[in-house]
Amino acid sequence: MNNEEKKVNEEIVVEDQIEAIGTEADVEWNESMEESQDAKIAELEAALLASQAQLKEQQDAVLRAKAEEQNVRRRAEGDIDKARKYALKKFAGELLPVIDNLERALESGDKENEAAKVLLEGVELTLQTFISTIEKFGLTVINPVGETFNPEHHQAIGMQASPDHESNTVMVVMQKGYSLNEQVIRPAMVMVAQ
């Protein structure tokens, strides 16, 4: 092989290498494509992170909304219960004078008179039925004879010396007290031993 053939072969090899590598513009284009793809990947990663953050915020908002809904429901149930108790308390308070009057009728009635005796028995049955009915709704009688004076349940009308009773003990109940579901509606009016 002569020099010319060698030169031609070398040129062909160089041309093949140039074609394989491509032009400088092709190299720049490839590099810019890689940069573009890297930028696109970074942009997509940022969008993914933003979407994940937004999803977390929305999940938190849903949880807060559920908690608020439960709180509103609990408050509403509590308000309904309070309204029911208040209405029952007010109603029971209005019934107390009726009970007092029935008890006074029994105390002042003539038990010796046969005609009055039958009437008093009817009043007593009415009173017992009335009291048992209101007890079903949580109303209880406070009749503290012999108990230690408790200012939360008793109202002292006066104090009196008594050798038969310990100091600060209820001797006499002037007017019975009543409580509804363990809440005093009317304290018992009492005389307390000194």
UniProtKB/Swiss-Prot annotation:
One of its GO terms (cellular component) is cytosol. Its main location: cytoplasm. GO terms for molecular function: adenyl-nucleotide exchange factor activity; protein homodimerization activity; protein-folding chaperone binding; unfolded protein binding. Keywords: Chaperone, Cytoplasm, Stress response. Signal peptide: none annotated. GO terms for biological process: protein folding. Coiled coil: none annotated. It is found in: Cytoplasm. The keyword Cytoplasm applies. PROSITE patterns: GRPE. The keyword Nucleus does not apply. InterPro entries: GrpE, GrpE_coiled_coil, GrpE_head. Belongs to the GrpE family. Homodimer. Participates actively in the response to hyperosmotic and heat shock by preventing the aggregation of stress-denatured proteins, in association with DnaK and GrpE. It is the nucleotide exchange factor for DnaK and may function as a thermosensor. Unfolded proteins bind initially to DnaJ; upon interaction with the DnaJ-bound protein, DnaK hydrolyzes its bound ATP, resulting in the formation of a stable complex. GrpE releases ADP from DnaK; ATP binding to DnaK triggers the release of the substrate protein, thus completing the reaction cycle. This is Protein GrpE. It comes from Aliivibrio salmonicida (strain LFI1238) (Vibrio salmonicida (strain LFI1238)).
